A protein has these predicted regions:
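ER/Golgi luminal nucleotide-sugar-dependent glycosyltransferases, focusing on the catalytic module
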Residues: 1-15, 70, 79, 84-87, ...
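Amphipathic repeat-derived elements
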Residues: 19-47, 95-111, 171-176, 184-197
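Low-complexity, flexible helical/coil segments
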Residues: 69-74, 87-102, 156-162, 169-176
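Generic alpha-helical secondary structure signal
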Residues: 2-6, 101-104, 108, 149, ...
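A long amphipathic alpha-helix within ATP-dependent nucleotide-binding catalytic cores
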Residues: 25-36, 76-131
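Phosphate-binding site of ATP-dependent enzymes
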Residues: 2-90
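C-terminal active-site "lid" helix and adjoining low-complexity regulatory extension at the edge
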Residues: 126-208
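Catalytic cores of PAPS-dependent sulfotransferases
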Residues: 46-47, 51-67, 71, 102-119, ...
Length: 208
């Protein structure tokens, strides 16, 4: 028991201090560290990890993953209608993979939860039928994701919904409001700039 307590203390301290590292959610640093023990929901069955990217209540992309966060992890992106995104270069799910029966319910639940937010990623686990709630985050990967096709598309949609963010939708004290006034001017200019550029048309992969 004494050895376990030492290991537990070292593990918790490492995780707690790691929140300030690059690639971590630094905004959580004031949250008191706690241990959360979750009951096992799969009972030996394989689970699909689904994460839904939502802008102001409208789902844009979903990622489905098997064996998530293991060496055997495979994943791919899908549109909210369940078709595979053609633009992705590194889809690794098996060719026979089909979206779970709970896929469309996950979309509806995520859209309802994210209504009124500029951006949320809403995560679920599913055994195919049952749907288990997971993490909800405002900035996946601490906002340090790769500058790929997905990020470029999400960037456009995020700018369109950004006025819903807490900083821009809530009166702010000085001097923060000075910065936000300048940011609003930049946001308007950036939206105008993007509106003059051609928007790539997303493609659906062939079902066969």
């Amino acid at each position: 028991e004494r050895q376990f307590r030492r290991w537990l203390r070292a593990s918790v301290n490492k995780r707690r201090l790691g929140w300030l590292d690059k690639g971590q959610e630094w905004t959580y640093w004031r949250v008191p560290p706690k241990i959360l023990v979750e009951r096992q929901v799969a009972e030996g069955r394989a689970l699909v990890d689904m994460s839904v990217r939502v802008f102001d209540g409208e789902a844009f992309l979903l990622n489905c993953a098997l064996n998530f966060k293991t060496e055997a992890s495979t994943d791919a992106y899908f549109w909210p209608d369940g078709t595979l995104v053609a633009e992705q270069k590194e889809a690794t799910l098996p060719a026979h993979f089909a979206v779970p029966a709970s896929f469309h319910r996950a979309v509806r639940v995520a859209e309802r939860l994210a209504q009124g937010f500029d951006y949320l990623r809403v995560d679920f686990l599913t055994d195919g039928e049952a749907l288990f709630a997971g993490e909800i985050t405002c900035f996946p990967a601490s906002g340090l994701g790769p500058d790929d096709w997905f990020m470029q598309q999400m960037y456009r949609r995020w700018l369109d919904a950004l006025s819903l963010s807490w900083a821009l939708s809530t009166p702010q004290p000085w001097p923060r409001r000075l910065y936000l006034a300048a940011f609003r001017r930049w946001l308007t200019a950036r939206r105008t700039e993007l509106a003059s550029e051609p928007t790539p048309v997303p493609r659906r992969a062939n079902s066969d």
